[in-house]
Amino acid sequence: MGYRSDVMMLCSINFDNKTMHLTSVPRDMWVKVPKSMDENGNVLTSTEQRINTAYSFGGGPDKDGAKFAMKCMEDFLSLDGMFDVKIDYYVSIDIDGLYKLADDIGGVEVVMDRYVAGVGNKGDTVTINKSNIDAYIRTRKGAGDDYGRVSRQQDYIMAVAKKIKAMGTTEAVTSMYGTITQYAKTNLSLDQCLSLAGFVKDFDLDNLTKYTITGNGFRTSGGASVLKVDEEKLKSYMLEYFYDQEA
């Protein structure tokens, strides 16, 4: 099955409070995935599969991959309708584009939290660029399993945001523009992209938080090793981060 998502990350921005929160879901999370949808975005048929297959069921980047992935994430986070979750926008980028983006901005520095073959040892400060980004964001065997990989993906996004601030949004966007137009897809308008660039320019990185949704190891009837979400933990997380407890 082609077009499976290596990274699925929800970015929630509060423009009033000037905060940003990243929610990651491991790609092996076992969920209900839409197989077909009508033109209004209603699910017609579904199946249980890894969450990273939703993009593929939608036909990938040139069809409705993003639409299916967004709907799958909405339904997963809603816990069968317990919460009203609406994801408005998406940005998807081909893995080759991610490699090139790393070089477009001159690489980014990260501190290794564990040894990763081809990247560095625990405690090392390493520049992530085209030569080692694949190992850094995709390796899991011997490098902290799926959760270790997700943590590194979040660290990479935070390092990119830091580098963009240091470069200045105008220089950074100019450097990345060619790669973005070639490899990325989004339903954000140009004005919205510019607004986000302005937000990042003045954003305090101390207000960027992250969380990884966890699950329990589970083996499917077909023998696949996957994760089943801890629904009580997910419920608590949704209430804490997305709902006003005083309302």
Features from the language model and the residues they span:
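Non-catalytic, solvent-exposed segments at the cell envelope interface
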Residues: M1-A247
